[in-house]
Amino acid sequence: MAFMKKYLLPLLGLFLAYYYYSANEEFRPEMLQGKKVIVTGASKGIGKEIAFHLAKMGAHVVVTARSKETLQEVVAHCLKLGAASAHYIAGTMEDMTFAEQFVAKAGKLMGGLDMLILNHITNASLMFFNNDIHHVRKEMEVNFLSYVVLTVAALPMLKQSNGSIVVVSSLAGKIAHPLIAPYSASKFALDGFFSAIRKEHALTNVNVSITLCVLGLIDTDTAMKEVSGKIDMKAAPKEECALEIIKGGALRQDEVYYGNLQWTPLLLGNPGKRLIEFLHLRKFDISKLVNN
């Protein structure tokens, strides 16, 4: 009881105060003006809407996806909306060499990098797991491993700019979902890896923020086609979702929750979890870890 009064209650008070004040921090579109941003999976859906919002805010944008023709249309529209500059590089994230080279090319086009928004996924269908290991491997490579490759390639530039990494994930990466086992596994992997890297940045004073975006069902054409007649759930608008993703990255938030289940942030993003994480980090002797 004495330990709780002396340590835990004051710490909990500090965390509650942090959440209260950080929740009231205001986003301003000019935060993105002139910023150099990469958006993956930007030929349609959420990624395309992210690119359009960034363009309206006056950012430099480099987009990527597999479809060259669609990317050309996205870039043309970004320029009409007011982007400081807009470029595309077409390719597949199944190719890790492309992923690594893409970041270098994008950095040269913009003269640096301030924000890396990782949004791409491979196609996923609702079905019971049928022991298809090839499908699991593809989901993990595209939805997870390519994110790691892109991040490793981008970190030198992001460290120079004190930039941000924004990882678009899913509620399926916080709560296991049936019918999408490989997809869910890849999203859990994103949470585990990037949350760990965020803590490593805190321990080593690396000023590169990592924002994990936990999304519910969003009304993209692909998602609506897949869930039609299978899942009775209201979808949230992709345009607003894209804006919330940008806001979270600009405000350097640890996590962003977006969807029509309003209770999700209260249950999954609670200050008690943060307190436990904080106390856990205090156990690490960073000087010995760095020397090793």
Swiss-Prot record:
Gene3D superfamilies, A to Z: NAD(P)-binding Rossmann-like Domain (3.40.50.720)
Record localization: Endoplasmic reticulum membrane; Microsome membrane
Subunit structure: Homodimer.
Pfam families the record matches: adh_short
Active site: 183 (proton acceptor)
Encoding gene, per UniProt annotation: HSD11B1
Membrane topology: Single-pass type II membrane protein
Tissues expressing the protein: Expressed in the eye.
PANTHER family per the UniProt record, alphabetical: 11-BETA-HYDROXYSTEROID DEHYDROGENASE 1 (PTHR44279:SF1), HYDROXYSTEROID (11-BETA) DEHYDROGENASE 1-LIKE B-RELATED (PTHR44279)
Enzyme superclass (EC): oxidoreductase
GO biological process: steroid catabolic process
Example of a GO cellular component annotation carried by this entry: endoplasmic reticulum membrane
EC nos: 1.1.1.146, 1.1.1.201
Gene Ontology terms, MF aspect: 11-beta-hydroxysteroid dehydrogenase (NADP+) activity; 7-beta-hydroxysteroid dehydrogenase (NADP+) activity; cortisol dehydrogenase (NAD+) activity; steroid binding
Transmembrane segments: 8-24
Domain of life, per lineage: Eukaryota
Posttranslational mods: Glycosylated.
Keywords in alphabetical order: Endoplasmic reticulum, Glycoprotein, Lipid metabolism, Membrane, Microsome, NADP, Oxidoreductase, Signal-anchor, Steroid metabolism, Transmembrane, Transmembrane helix
Name the record gives this protein: 11-beta-hydroxysteroid dehydrogenase 1
Catalyzed chemical reaction(s): an 11beta-hydroxysteroid + NADP(+) = an 11-oxosteroid + NADPH + H(+); corticosterone + NADP(+) = 11-dehydrocorticosterone + NADPH + H(+); cortisone + NADPH + H(+) = cortisol + NADP(+); a 7beta-hydroxysteroid + NADP(+) = a 7-oxosteroid + NADPH + H(+)
Pathway membership, UniProt: Steroid metabolism
Keyword Acetylation: no
